[in-house]
């Protein structure tokens, strides 16, 4: 199997402004218009409710819509393999049937009801797609064993491998062979099945770097021949996947950088270094998925509290406001999910914890209403504001008359800083509604683990 080795302070106020009728410097045509100021919410059906079903999750849709969620990403909804299964319920990513529905979650009509309800309430809904491997009891194992990668030394089908073709401990899955044209075409047809049968709006592709860019170019073009607005997210940081017409790639490096800055093993200069690399390697119109949590991080690397501590909201503000960013919220993040959810067993989210939905709704509304913060090249240029504190990151973004200025303090103490390079204007404090003046240079005080977001002008 050929693998890719390419390196790849806050109160209760909300403001709004009208959306522009025209967009200058619009991105490539493959980005759907509805995605330009969208956010994403990852849904873990198994752990979301005590029932762990589509129907039970569906009752949460009005709450999520009120919070401002746009795109629902459902972790895999297909049946999970039994052979070599890990744990009692198994991994969502061990797919037994690409076209089936996991009976743990409900049936075909339950899923169709969820998709229809989501669309009626204004959401887009995408599903996880796992192209790299299947369960050991997938029908292809007996019907088309040539679809799988066989170890040249032993002739045996191998366990799932990473996107550098290295062995893993994924003993519950078998590796597919992306040098087999029939298998690749079968994958495309299975993806089309979900678009045609259930009208899903796109796919989050697991381990998208495990296939060739040519495969994804052909596949995505094929999918867009059926629905030009299908949305494609790659779980990968390989820049070339944008050239294959993925709308968005993962910001893994930025996530780990936030963990380090919050944990004081790095200062904010590393953010500038990261942005310089991104500007060099990634297209200006490519969306980047920024997050402080997701299913991988929560289950395997610890909670947000463990990794980021009291800086969670400060870090998330960067996920909302940074250049090219689309912010992601994971299931339970809006109640401060305080445990690592078990991956192979039932482990229901505790929704009785104090709600942080007010913060998240204001943050998402900021993204939605400020044209300077729009996704990809829809948004405005980002300009650094210099400070004399290595724990404070500050910048402005500008689109037309719209200015968004952000100060984030990763220190556990209140700080008074000197700054320079701001845009001298009259602003509104987004989170308090108070009027504020900001000169080009001066001093400003920020609360511990806090942030200040100032807005000016129309979107």
Question: What kind of region is each of these model predictions?
Answer:
Residues 4-12:
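Sec-dependent N-terminal signal peptides
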Residues 21-40, 44-55, 59-70, 76-198, ...:
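Substrate-binding/active-site clefts of carbohydrate-active enzymes
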Residues 73-87, 128-138, 206-212, 235-240, ...:
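Short, solvent-exposed turn/loop segments enriched in Gly/Ser/Thr/Pro and often Arg
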